[in-house]
Each structure stands twice: as structure tokens, then as C-alpha cells.
Amino acid sequence: MQKKYYELFFIVEERYKNLFLDFAFDLGIEAIEEKDNGVYIRSHESLEELSWALEIFAQKLTTTFNLNHKIISNLSLVEKENKDWIQEYKKGIKPILVDNVYIHTTWQEEKKNFINIKINPALAFGSGHHESTYSCVKFLQKFSKSKLRALDLGCGSGILGIIMAKFGCNVEICDTDELAIDSSLENARLNGVDFHKAWCGSIDKANGLYNLIVANIIADVILILEKDIKNHLEDNAILILSGILDKYSTRIKEKFQDLELIDEMQINEWCSFVYKNNKKG
């Protein structure tokens, strides 16, 4: 065991915390702990570049949300004597309960009488804590049915695809990041489910029509893919759109007004919409 390790600490506004956690995971950081109203990141490698990247990320979010104050503070990087910080990190990750779905890590116990979703957060994609993922999990429990042909568009860690598979859907997944596909396939293996098809790319590579499509991606990408998404919807299909900041919700609704909006949810500034393909002509 190395004698020293690096510890990066910062405080971030609660409503933006998950964005920073996902950002760090996407950069391959595995040891992250939430504690004392702040976030600790630990590594044997120098974290100077990550510290700089977090500051740049915070500046971009400040611009995106039109804020007039900093959303990250007390950013500090120190060198410390080594300890078993991997175990400390594991203690900091909390499982998630969304109605009948229980999302937990590979080292946490399953919950009896619930649909258990096991996720390895070390695979560098989301572990289900983000508001938009939470909304999708709630909606999928309502609209996932056995033998539906389903697509997880922009699958990330594969959580949503795994949930649909647990409900008996014939699931396909896609993502523009090959690492996301690998992560999803590994998490599917951990959960004892299979995806009927998986590819690196977007919905333009899909064949045929779907009864259920979930797209937990940012609004700009949804707007770009609007026509492709609609062209792959079966009659009366369900479309779940999530990952949408509230300031973009009007634009999304305008683009999808030819479909029937049957449900919606907003948690903090994150919006999710459920449409049914009853086209208005």
C-alpha cells in the first residue's frame, strides 16, 4: 500500500451535486464520498487536473443556469497519509428506493420483495441518483409490460434498460459512447438479464418500430433526434423523455405536440415527459 494519497474536497449546492458526481464518474473517478455537507474525492494519483476541471465545469454551469453566484466553494487539495479509503468510499454510497425498484451497488444487500437493480458505480456511468433517472424509474414501472419491444436511447449505465428487461420487455440499447455500452452490458450481466441488441451510435441505426422508448438525455440532443425518435414509434407506443432542464421544457413540448402528452414530472429544475403515439395528423 502506498504511504500517501491525494484528497480533493469541495462544497456544492445540493441541487447541483449530482451533476458534479456524474461529471467525476465520467472522468473515471471511482472513490467519491459525500460527507459533512461536502464531497471528498481520493486517489493515489495527483488530482490537480481534476480540481481544475471541476472549476471549469462549475463556471459552465453558472453560465448555463444564468447564476450570479458560485455553486462550488471550499475547493481544496491535500496530500494525506494512506488508509483504506476504498472502504470509506463504499460507506458513502446510498442505495435508492423508487416505489418497487431498489437500486444498489454490488456490495450492498438486496431488498426482499422488491425489484433489485445491482449497479457497479466503478464502471464510470450514473448510479441512478440523478433526478431525471429517478423520474424515468417511476415512469417505467407504470409503462413497462411483458414482450414490449423497448429501446433505451442513450443508455449510460444501463439502469433503465435493465428495469425494462426485469419487467419482461425485449430491450435494445444504444449510446454514442462505447464505454457506456460496455458498462450497460456488464451491469446487465450482474442483474441476470440480456439485451436483445446493443450498438454504439444513435437511433438512426435502429431497425423497425418500438412500443416503448426511453431517452434520458439532454434537451438539445432530444431536439436533434426528434424526427428519428418519432419515426421509430409503433402506433400507441409510449415515449419517455427526460434529462430536460425546465428552461427547455416549452421547446420540447412544441416539438412533440403532435403526440399525446399523458404524464409529466419535475424534480428541482429537471423535467420529464411521457407521450403516447396517438398522432394528431
Curated annotation (Swiss-Prot):
EC number(s) per entry: 2.1.1.-
Enzyme class: transferase
Membrane spanning stretches: none
Residues at which S-adenosyl-L-methionine binds: T133, G154, D175, N216
Subcellular location: Cytoplasm
Taxonomy, superkingdom: Bacteria
Function: Methylates ribosomal protein L11.
Protein name stated in the entry: Ribosomal protein L11 methyltransferase
Native source species: Campylobacter jejuni subsp. jejuni serotype O:6 (strain 81116 / NCTC 11828)
Gene this chain is encoded by: prmA
